[in-house]
Curated annotation (Swiss-Prot):
It catalyses: L-homoserine + ATP = O-phospho-L-homoserine + ADP + H(+). ATP binds at residues 90-100. It is found in: Cytoplasm. This is Homoserine kinase. Its main location: cytoplasm. It comes from the Bacteria. It comes from Staphylococcus epidermidis (strain ATCC 12228 / FDA PCI 1200). Pathway: Amino-acid biosynthesis; L-threonine biosynthesis; L-threonine from L-aspartate: step 4/5. One of its GO terms (cellular component) is cytoplasm. Its EC number is 2.7.1.39. GO terms for molecular function: ATP binding; homoserine kinase activity. Belongs to the GHMP kinase family. Homoserine kinase subfamily.
Length: 306
């Protein structure tokens, strides 16, 4: 019998406006992976979607490098593997594609190296590699999660928030925006006054989400001062999306992660009309309704006749 590990890894949206590098939510767009042992000296990567075209298929592959680094960390040896991949998560669009790949690599190393890492340990490892938990935490656990990574202790603490009862619209531009380029425009420091103000806005947003006060939560999301004022000019469609969304009584329109994808939270009774309007008025972008993934990574092992 041939043993195949199957992974279904969700996309994620980070920040929700003012929750910079600390808040994220899993979405129902996925990286699918099927992994099996092969009798070869090298790993084999097979891609079955346009989103993955151009990615390395040799030792420069990020999943390969990460899995081997984890195996080395725990003093185990991984067999040669064949990894089949398909994805509907666009690359470099602010939807956690790199976090999904990272989490996939950790699950691969954990299973085929028989390391026996718990989900908590997988989170610690993922955050240490990524530097912040905003994408990897919801990717692993699902739902809406706030977290803090302490770079001194290398410990990540997270708390799960009930997912908002709203509809989610993604407006995905046709161009990429690399995280490193998007981070380059951010200031190195903030004044004490500015930090206090943004902390207050973030705290209020969290409380409003917990209390299902989505108008208040949205008001706070749109007052971010940590990153959005510096990044909006990189996304020409942003202001028009926010304007149209407000005309349809949306709760908030913010940048998803580092962008360029634009995230809109909308009342369920308004979302259909809004997404159709966005498709009509901003037709160079792909606007779509998505739902929140609440379970995180789905992994299963299947056995096939050889």
């Amino acid at each position: 019998m041939e043993e195949v590990l199957k992974l279904k890894i969700p996309a994620s949206t980070a920040n929700l406006g003012v929750g910079f590098d600390s808040i994220g939510m899993a979405l129902d767009k996925y990286l699918h992976m099927s992994i099996r042992k092969i009798e070869r000296s090298n790993w084999e990567f097979l891609y079955y979607s346009s989103e993955l075209e151009g990615l390395p298929k040799d030792e420069n592959n990020y999943i390969y490098q990460t899995a081997l680094n984890v195996a080395h960390k725990y003093n185990v040896t991984l067999p040669s593997l064949q990894i089949e991949m398909r994805s509907d998560i666009p690359l470099a669009r602010g939807l956690g594609s790199s976090a999904s790949a990272l989490v996939g690599a950790l699950f691969i190393a954990n299973y085929f190296g028989n390391i026996q890492l718990s989900k908590y340990e997988l989170l610690q490892l993922a955050t240490e590699i990524e530097g912040h938990p905003d994408n990897v935490a919801p990717t692993i656990y699902g739902g809406l999660i706030a977290g803090f990574y302490n770079p001194i202790t290398k410990i990540t603490d997270v708390a799960r928030i009930e997912v908002p009862h709203v509809d989610i619209i993604l407006t995905i531009p046709p161009y990429e925006l690399r995280t490193e380029d998007s981070r380059r425009v951010l200031p190195d420091t903030f004044s004490h006054k500015g930090a206090v103000q943004n902390s207050a806005i973030s705290n209020t947003m969290i409380c409003a989400l917990i209390q299902h006060k989505y108008k208040l939560a949205g008001k706070m999301m749109e007052q971010d001062g940590f990153h959005e004022p510096y990044r909006q000019h990189l996304i020409p469609e942003f202001n028009q999306v926010r304007k149209l969304s407000r005309q349809h009584d949306a709760y908030a329109t913010v940048i998803s992660g580092a962008g360029p994808t634009i995230l809109t939270l909308c009342p369920k009774e308004k979302s259909g009309k809004l997404v159709r309007t966005l498709r009509e008025k901003i037709n160079n972008c792909a606007s779509e309704l998505v739902t929140i993934n609440e379970i995180g990574v789905k992994d299963e092992v299947v056995y096939l006749k050889s």
